[in-house]
Structure formats: structure tokens, C-alpha cells
């Protein structure tokens, strides 16, 4: 297996343009996310360089651009705040350790080939937690948007402090933030071809703050340390280890989802197919290295990836070029960033938060499915007010329960029992003949489709509806999968029939279905001679074994079908 991503020089010009353009987009976003996280602008910048470089080098999506993203920043903001509050001296170092641990989780997910399962999550849950993350990012920008420091306590703390924030608003900084949002929102599309709106807003906001409001006390980034970052060795504390592990697992899983969803977008634009497991390994390596050098964790960024592709990027070389361009800018122009107003960065992050919210699905979710909409709203509320683990866990659980209920209801209709020719079951002429000759004494019990645990009740109900018969033919020809619970229900039906002296025949038990019945020792109730591959033969032998019908008091040949 190739260790590195797909890199060649046949598309050098396109990759060069894509990488440079993606770097221009990344610069203001990295600054904004670094400040928003509480780790500082430097952490955001180095996260953009390091995650982007290693994810591009070792990942499985040639055109993916990786960097700190809105969802990852929201989680890291909470991690940094909680660890710094618990240990002011080592909290930030432990937060970077969490980023490294998150990367190790991602590498493990990739090596275990769990990539294909990461995005197998109901869209209502994905939409809900992404929208919740967007709302959190918007709320967390309210304080710097109003020209003040972010209060402690995250979302709840910000909402509680909102009256005080509004009463002490700094109009100039709020004006700069509003101007930033306005430029990003309303910049004409034809201008965006020449310069990304985030960079335009960053430059204009900084120039205006210096030229028009230079004599005012405006909060700015301040000095950014020049030179390469120092090595941040992992720091652990016994009393914080459990929290760090949980935070790392959440951050790692969120990064996996974020990256692979963006990889799907890249596939649709380039008509290629990414390697999800390889991508997770690349993302993990990037985050381990970023945490090791004091950078924020990152994931696949939709905006940067789309811009890269639209500018001509087609191989991982574009991601490597982007990282190198950012590195040169950081080393050569770090001092210029010191004058950037925090309100401008808050405006950029605010707009990112608004964009993360899944407005398209929010507007029509209730038209698609009321239950799905309720799940999405519940996940949003839990994400914003409780935490991401509870939101995703509860959302996935409820969504899966509802899905299983629907599947069980559909599969229950495939459990049928008849004692004469019936339109519900497609029978051949011979099968109809033998059922008619059975005169109600032979019952055909048919199961079809995957038999999951929700169908067990239908099997029991159908079996309980049987009144009188001398022989039962269990047709499993169309059962590709027999779950444990459904197997036990079938075993119970066969055992009860045998105890009542009824002849039992099994048709079409092959593969996984047969192995499951063998493990449950169901065939102890059924002689080997009563196991058939052909339903017609089973019905014929069942009727012949019973002999001629002798009494008018024997069971009626009318249908005893019950369908669920």
C-alpha cells in the first residue's frame, strides 16, 4: 500500500494556483480560530500549517485541504477553558496533549478500517450537531463582537453575561465586526475571483482601525512570536486523565466526521473516490504533529477544499504548496498581524458559525419527517446546552430505534402462514395443488428478507394464530440473514410444533441461516429427511406422509393467514 498521498507533477500549474489560493483563504481563518479557541493566533496559524502539511502528505484524498475548522475550534475552546480552569499553569499544555491524543484515536480508527462507518450516521443527527456547533461558535463570538473579553463558562456563561456585555458595548469594535460580516456576506461574486472576502475584510478592517480609529483603545492580536514553534511535550495529570481521554475521543471523532464529509464533497467535484481509512491516518498524523508543536487540531475544511479544486488543484501537491506558502507568510510577516483588531477576527468567525448551521435542512426538515425534525432539534439543543457526546449519543440511539421500528414493521409483513392457495404468497401450480390436497392439515409458514430482532414478535404472533394442523412447512428460502432474536422466536415455534406432535419441515435453510439454526440446535426437532431445498417437494411429502383425509371434522381448508 502506498504510504503517502497521490503526488505527481503533471498538474503543477493547477496545484500551484490551488495551493496559493487556499493559503490566502486559510490565513484569516487560522487567525480567527486561534483567537476564538483561547490558545492564541499563533496556535491557529501553526495548526493550519502542520495539520495541512501532514494530512496532505499522508492522507487519502488528493485535493483535501486540512486546517482548524469551526467545529473543531468549538470543541477545543471548551477543552482549553476547562483544563486551564483546572490547572492554570499546565492547562494549555494538557490541551495540546488532547490534540495529540485525538490524532492517535484517528490513526487507530484508520488502521482498524473504521473509516466507512464514521459517516454512517443519520443525517438528522449530523445536521443537528453541526448546526449546534455553528450556534455555539456564533454565541462565543458575541463578546469580542461587542468589543469585550469572552466571559468564563462557555455558551451558558456568555448568555448569562449578555446583558452586561450589551450595556458595556464598544461601538467602534462592534462597527468593525459588523463591517467584516458585511464584506464577507455581500461582496460581489465577480470580485471573489480576485480575492477571498475573508482576506479583504481582514485587510480593510485593519487599515480602517489604524487610519480612522488609531487613537482609540481597540483590542488587537498583539505580538505574534516569530520563528519556528517550540516543541510541546505531552503533559498528563492523574486527576485530569479521564477528562482528557474523553475530550480526545470526542475531538478525534469530530475530526473524522468533518474530514470525511469534506472528502465526499471533494469526490463529487473531482469525480474521484477517496480512501477513507488512509485519510483518517493522515488526519491523525497531522493532529499529533500539530499538538506536538503547539498548534490547534484540524480537519478537512470544505471552503479551502472547494477553492483549491476550483483553482485547479488535483493532487496532494496543492495541499503541500498551501502549507509552505503559509509557513513563509508566518515567518516573514508575523509582525504585521499584531495590529489586526480582535473584532475583525470575531466577525470572520461569526460568519463561519452562521455558515455551519444547516439552514437548508432546517427550513424543510418538518416537511420531510416530523420525527426526524424533532431528533434534529433535540440534538441541536443538547449540543448547545449540554455537550456533544450526549447530543450525538442520544440522537443516534433514538434515530436507530425509529429506523429499527420501521424496518421491523416492513419485515413483519414478510412473515405469513397459509393452509391453502393464497395471493399473498406466490405459489407454483404444484404447490397450490399440494396445499389443496392437504385440506388445511398442512400449513406453509413463510419468512422472507432479513429477519432482524424486531421481527421476532411477528413470528410469535403468526405462530400463535395457528389453530389446528398436522404438519408445518417452514420456508426460509428467501431469508439471507437470521438475527439471534428472530432465530430464538423461530426455534420456539418449531419446538412448540414438535411438542404438539406436528410434523415439521424446513425448506431453503442455507448459508448464515442454516449455521445460526445449527448453533441453536434447532435441527434436533427436525429429522434430516424433513429438510428440503425445494418447497414443492416439502409440501408434497408433508401431504403424502399424512395420508388421505378421512373425516369431515378435520380442519377446514380455509385460510388461516394473518399478516403483520
From Swiss-Prot:
Q: Can you tell me which residues bind Na(+)?
A: 258, 262, 300, 302
Q: Which InterPro entries match?
A: SLC26A/SulP_dom, SLC26A/SulP_fam, STAS_dom, STAS_dom_sf
Q: Where in the cell is it found?
A: Cell inner membrane
Q: Which GO terms describe its biological process?
A: sodium ion transport; transmembrane transport
Q: Name the positions where hydrogencarbonate binds.
A: 69, 301
* Record membrane topology: Multi-pass membrane protein
| One Gene Ontology cellular component annotation held by this UniProt entry | plasma membrane
Q: Which keywords annotate this record?
A: Cell inner membrane, Cell membrane, Ion transport, Membrane, Metal-binding, Sodium, Sodium transport, Transmembrane, Transmembrane helix, Transport
**What are the GO MF terms of this UniProt record?**
metal ion binding
Q: Which residues form the STAS domain?
A: 432-542
- Which regions span the lipid bilayer? 12-37, 41-58, 71-86, 91-112, 123-145, 171-185, 197-211, 241-269, 276-292, 303-312, 316-338, 342-357, 370-390, 393-405
* Principal location: membrane
Effect recorded for residue 486 to E: Alters bicarbonate transport
Kindly report every residue range on the membrane side named Cytoplasmic.
1-11, 59-70, 113-122, 186-196, 270-275, 313-315, 358-369, 406-564
Which consequence is recorded for altering residue 69 to A? Alters bicarbonate transport
Query: Keyword Plastid: yes or no?
Result: no
**Annotated Pfam families:** STAS, Sulfate_transp
Task: Specify whether Translocase is a keyword of the entry.
Answer: no
UniProt effect for mutating residue 262 to A = Alters bicarbonate transport
- Residues assigned to the Periplasmic compartment are 38-40, 87-90, 146-170, 212-240, 293-302, 339-341, 391-392
What is the similarity comment for this entry?
A: Belongs to the SLC26A/SulP transporter (TC 2.A.53) family.
Spell out the subunit comment: Forms homodimers through the STAS cytoplasmic domain.
**Which named protein is this?**
Bicarbonate transporter BicA
Q: Which organism is it from?
A: Synechocystis sp. (strain ATCC 27184 / PCC 6803 / Kazusa)
| Taxonomic lineage of the native organism | Bacteria, Bacillati, Cyanobacteriota, Cyanophyceae, Synechococcales
List the gene name: bicA
Amino acid at each position: 500500500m502506498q504510504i503517502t498521498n497521490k503526488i505527481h507533477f503533471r498538474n503543477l500549474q493547477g496545484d500551484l494556483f490551488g495551493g496559493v489560493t487556499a493559503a490566502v483563504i486559510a490565513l484569516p481563518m487560522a487567525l480567527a480560530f486561534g483567537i476564538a479557541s483561547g490558545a492564541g493566533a499563533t496556535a491557529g496559524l501553526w495548526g493550519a500549517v502542520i495539520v495541512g502539511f501532514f494530512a496532505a502528505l499522508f492522507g487519502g484524498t488528493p485535493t483535501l485541504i486540512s486546517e482548524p475548522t469551526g467545529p473543531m475550534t468549538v470543541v477545543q475552546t471548551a477543552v482549553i477553558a476547562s483544563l486551564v480552569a483546572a490547572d492554570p499553569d499546565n492547562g494549555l499544555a494538557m490541551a495540546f496533549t488532547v490534540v495529540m491524543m485525538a490524532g492517535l484515536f484517528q490513526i487507530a480508527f484508520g488502521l482498524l478500517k473504521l473509516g466507512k462507518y464514521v459517516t454512517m450516521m443519520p443525517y438528522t443527527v449530523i445536521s443537528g450537531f453541526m448546526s449546534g456547533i455553528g450556534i455555539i461558535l456564533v454565541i462565543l463570538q458575541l463578546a469580542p463582537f461587542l468589543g469585550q473579553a469572552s466571559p468564563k463558562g462557555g455558551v451558558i456563561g456568555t448568555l448569562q453575561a449578555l446583558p452586561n456585555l450589551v450595556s458595556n458595548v464598544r461601538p467602534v469594535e462592534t462597527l468593525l465586526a459588523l463591517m467584516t460580516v458585511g464584506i464577507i456576506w455581500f461582496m460581489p461574486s465577480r470580485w471573489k475571483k480576485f480575492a477571498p472576502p475573508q482576506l479583504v475584510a481582514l485587510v480593510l478592517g485593519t487599515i480602517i482601525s489604524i487610519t480612522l480609529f488609531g487613537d482609540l483603545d481597540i483590542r488587537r492580536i498583539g505580538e505574534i512570536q516569530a520563528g519556528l514553534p517550540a516543541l510541546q511535550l505531552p503533559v498528563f495529570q492523574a486527576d485530569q486523565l479521564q477528562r482528557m481521554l474523553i475530550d480526545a475521543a470526542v475531538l478525534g471523532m469530530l475530526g473524522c466526521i468533518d474530514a470525511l464529509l469534506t472528502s465526499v464533497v471533494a469526490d463529487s467535484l473531482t469525480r474521484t473516490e477517496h480512501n477513507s481509512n488512509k485519510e483518517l491516518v493522515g488526519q491523525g498524523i497531522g493532529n499529533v504533529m500539530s499538538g506536538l508543536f503547539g498548534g490547534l487540531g484540524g480537519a478537512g475544511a470544505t471552503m479551502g477544499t472547494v477553492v483549491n479544486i476550483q483553482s485547479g488543484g488535483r493532487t496532494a501537491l496543492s495541499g503541500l504548496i498551501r502549507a509552505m506558502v503559509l509557513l513563509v507568510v508566518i515567518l516573514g510577516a508575523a509582525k504585521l498581524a499584531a495590529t489586526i483588531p480582535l473584532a475583525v477576527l470575531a466577525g470572520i468567525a461569526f460568519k463561519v458559525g452562521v455558515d455551519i448551521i444547516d439552514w437548508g435542512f432546517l427550513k424543510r426538515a418538518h416537511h420531510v419527517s416530523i420525527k426526524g425534525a424533532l431528533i434534529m432539534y433535540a440534538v441541536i439543543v443538547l449540543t448547545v446546552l449540554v455537550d456533544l457526546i450526549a447530543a450525538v449519543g442520544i440522537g443516534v440511539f433514538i434515530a436507530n430505534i425509529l429506523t429499527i421500528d420501521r424496518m421491523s414493521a416492513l419485515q413483519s409483513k414478510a412473515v405469513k402462514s397459509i393452509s391453502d392457495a393464497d395471493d399473498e404468497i406466490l405459489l407454483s401450480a404444484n404447490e397450490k395443488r399440494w396445499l389443496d390436497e392437504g385440506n388445511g392439515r398442512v400449513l406453509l409458514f413463510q419468512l422472507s428478507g432479513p429477519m432482524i430482532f424486531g421481527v421476532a414478535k411477528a413470528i410469535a404472533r403468526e405462530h400463535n394464530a395457528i389453530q389446528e394442523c398436522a404438519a408445518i412447512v417452514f420456508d426460509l428460502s428467501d431469508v439471507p440473514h437470521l438475527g439471534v432474536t428472530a432465530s430464538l422466536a423461530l426455534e420456539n415455534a418449531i419446538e412448540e410444533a414438535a411438542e404438539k406432535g406436528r410434523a415439521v419441515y424446513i425448506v431453503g435453510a442455507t448459508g448464515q441461516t442454516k449455521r445460526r439454526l445449527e448453533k441453536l440446535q434447532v435441527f434436533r426437532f427436525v429429522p434430516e429427511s424433513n429438510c428440503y431445498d425445494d418447497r414443492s417437494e416439502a409440501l408434497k411429502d408433508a401431504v403424502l406422509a399424512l395420508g388421505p383425509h378421512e373425516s369431515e371434522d378435520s380442519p377446514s381448508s380455509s385460510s388461516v393467514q394473518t399478516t403483520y
